[in-house]
A protein has these predicted regions:
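Compositionally biased regions
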Residues: 8, 18, 23, 91, ...
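Exposed beta-strand face motif in extracellular beta-rich ectodomains
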Residues: 75-79
Length: 167
């Protein structure tokens, strides 16, 4: 009888430790961003698709939040924030080269160790751990001059394109 009790107890411990979940509150400061009319989302990696969880800002303070139940075993998995409803991931934050990104996983963020309910506060496109945002660099006026005196083609205009204008 003692062995049966111990076996049942061991199975209960194994099952409950195997299925540990926690509520993780994600707070995302969007003060430096023009928020898309499509919404702000959390997705990627262990979270799911690009529109898996919509964040909301009911008090209008610029901090968008969502509570997500996550398996504790997903610690170290990836996630990302998106400014807009873009199934092709085109509106995800750009963390390339920042210390909070995982270059082996599309430069997504890395979940910290999850041992219980917790809060993650950060800034869109930055590695803040307290929810604060660094001021964006000041805008600069740039003048491009193109010498077209040697051009013999038929186009009548010069266009400049790049990542700065959505190219």
């Amino acid at each position: 009888m003692k062995n049966v009790f111990l076996s049942v107890f061991a199975m209960l411990v194994a099952v409950t430790s195997w299925a540990q979940t926690s509520v993780v509150t994600f707070n995302l400061n969007m003060e430096n961003e023009t928020v898309s009319e499509g919404g702000v989302y959390l997705g990627g990696g262990v979270i799911g698709g690009p529109t898996e969880h919509e964040l909301t800002d009911p008090d209008g303070d610029g901090v968008y939040s969502v509570d997500v139940v996550i398996n504790n075993e997903d610690s170290g998995g990836n996630y990302i924030f998106l400014n807009g409803n873009c199934p092709d991931w085109s509106c995800k934050e750009n963390l390339q080269g920042l210390p909070c990104s995982d270059p082996a996983n599309w430069n997504d963020r890395i979940l910290p160790e999850i041992n219980g309910d917790m809060t993650i506060s950060t800034c869109f496109g930055q590695c803040s751990e307290d929810g604060s945002c660094q001021a964006p660099p000041p805008a600069s006026a740039v003048t491009f001059r193109v010498d077209m005196s040697e051009y013999t083609g038929t186009y009548g205009a010069v266009n400049l394109n790049g990542s700065f204008n959505g190219w």
